[in-house]
Amino acid sequence: MAKQPSDVSSECDREGGQLQPAERPPQLRPGAPTSLQTEPQGNPDGEGDRCPHGSPQGPLAPPASPGPFATRSPLFIFVRRSSLLSRSSSGYFSFDTDRSPAPMSCDKSTQTPSPPCQAFNHYLSAMASIRQSQEEPEDLRPEIRIAQELRRIGDEFNETYTRRVFANDYREAEDHPQMVILQLLRFIFRLVWRRH
């Protein structure tokens, strides 16, 4: 059976907060509206906080929302979830387990990065250095343009030369039909060799 809000004796944590007896809410009949508001007691600021200001649930703590099982009850307006209460998968509250603290964030000044992170950082720095080395100074740019033009001229020459040689070999091969077959086999062999 689920524990009622009246069974909870305090909302303050174990850091010196004083335990206060639980107040029993007035009983509502089953058909009564659940949107009744109660006056907050104990804190004149109107925050409804019964814990001392030094506790984690002090005046700056966000208000806890009722759980999904508490909102089904007509008394859900009196339920306030505490940090001491944890809920198992069945929805019942228990005091047995404590919530684990949030994991600490990575302090970049004291912690070394993980090996994958180190490898990725090394890759990024290597790529940055390659980009910097590809940016040549202005005094080398004319030589690079000349080299690119010479390469283009060489590529054009190779393209026209291979066409002439292939055309001449084909004309000579017309005289010898076996040479046509050998030239085609050689071409197929080169094509297959390049694909592997």
Swiss-Prot record:
Protein name: Bcl-2-like protein 11
Role: Induces apoptosis and anoikis. The isoforms vary in cytotoxicity with isoform BimS being the most potent and isoform BimEL being the least potent.
Record's subcellular location: Membrane; Mitochondrion
InterPro entries given in the database record: Apoptosis_Bim_N (IPR014771), Bcl-2-like_11 (IPR017288), Bcl-x_interacting_BH3_dom (IPR015040), Immune_Signaling-Apoptosis_Reg (IPR052133)
Domain comment quoted from the record: The BH3 motif is required for the interaction with Bcl-2 proteins and cytotoxicity.
Motif (BH3): 146-160
Gene: Bcl2l11
Induction section of the entry: By ER stress.
Pfam families for the chain: Bclx_interact, Bim_N
